[in-house]
């Protein structure tokens, strides 16, 4: 499975973990120490945030996808031995895609490493489904990619870190979640291998997923919902108020649609939302039913 992921992502080597949370938790502490610096997007996943907390490197945080602020932080960290830029490939609460092309340009300019957590992209983003680095045209320029086997690559559990061979070799020797935890169950590895084979053999599922995403996004906009713009299958329906998000989620469950309301501290105050995740397994009838139920709930809540 490690070899197959390496081939699929176009990297040099891969190491498996029991989860992507463990992959991120075992990365920064292993690679970075006091003389180093990590520059992290402010909307990064909790696992990146917690992983960075475990290391002793200098920490800088830049405004999300703000390249001017990222450059300013790289300059602030000029005296660091090594600098690493850390970002989600796709931000899980927004469905927005990192500006990896510009990030890689800045990394080249300031001799920094680039790390992405691509859990919400590998398997369907990019021409061949390889993820954000393929989607943004920077394959071969990202030093470290972490990801999960719990979404498009099998839907069960497990995670990985993939990238430059010297980095992966070092993780095998020093990364605590790898050394002191269990490996994947064989059935999970087999399912993930099969998932990669399916993704590699045909683009049909990716095309269906993107068609479903367009249908749902366009339909919800016509119904008057405020959704964050984009092309990703994560579709945030912005409601603002935490109680409203909870009420909407409860109404939808009563109508046979399971969605979750997110609010502070998971998202910033005043930006409560329902996060919908579209699948290639959804039929047009499924999507139309979901939109009809959203319209009913919207009317019942007086929106």
Which residues does each PLM region occupy?
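PLP-dependent enzyme catalytic core of the Aspartate aminotransferase-like
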Residues: 7, 254-257, 266-303
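Conserved PLP-anchoring active-site segment centered on the Schiff-base-forming lysine
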Residues: 27-46
């Amino acid at each position: 499975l490690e070899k197959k992921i390496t081939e699929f992502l176009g990297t040099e080597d891969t190491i498996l973990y029991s989860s992507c949370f463990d992959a991120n938790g075992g990365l920064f502490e292993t690679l970075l120490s006091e003389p180093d610096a990590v520059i992290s997007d402010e909307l990064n996943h909790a696992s990146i945030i917690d992983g960075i907390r475990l290391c002793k490197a200098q920490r800088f945080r830049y405004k999300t996808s703000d390249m001017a602020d990222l450059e300013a932080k790289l300059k602030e960290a000029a005296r660091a031995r090594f600098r690493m830029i850390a970002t989600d490939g796709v931000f899980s609460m927004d469905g927005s895609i990192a500006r990896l092309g510009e990030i890689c340009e800045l990394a080249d300019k300031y001799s920094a490493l680039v790390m992405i957590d691509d859990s919400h992209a590998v398997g369907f983003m990019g021409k061949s489904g390889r993820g954000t680095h393929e989607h943004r045209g920077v394959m071969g320029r990202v030093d470290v990619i972490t990801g999960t086997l719990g979404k498009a690559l099998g839907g069960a559990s497990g995670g990985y870190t993939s990238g430059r061979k010297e980095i992966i070799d070092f993780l095998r020797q020093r990364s605590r979640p790898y050394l002191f935890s269990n490996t994947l169950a064989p059935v999970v590895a087999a399912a993930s291998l099969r998932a990669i084979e399916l993704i590699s053999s045909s683009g049909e599922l990716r095309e269906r997923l993107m068609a479903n995403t367009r249908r749902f996004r366009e339909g919800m906009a016509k119904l008057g919902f405020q959704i964050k713009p984009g092309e990703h299958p994560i579709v945030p329906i912005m409601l603002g108020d935490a109680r409203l998000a909870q009420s909407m989620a409860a109404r939808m469950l009563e109508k046979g649609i399971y969605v979750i309301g997110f609010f502070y501290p998971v998202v910033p105050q005043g930006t409560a939302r329902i996060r919908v995740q579209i699948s290639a397994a959804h039929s047009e009838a499924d999507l139309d039913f979901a939109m009809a139920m959203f319209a009913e709930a919207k009317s019942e809540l007086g929106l």
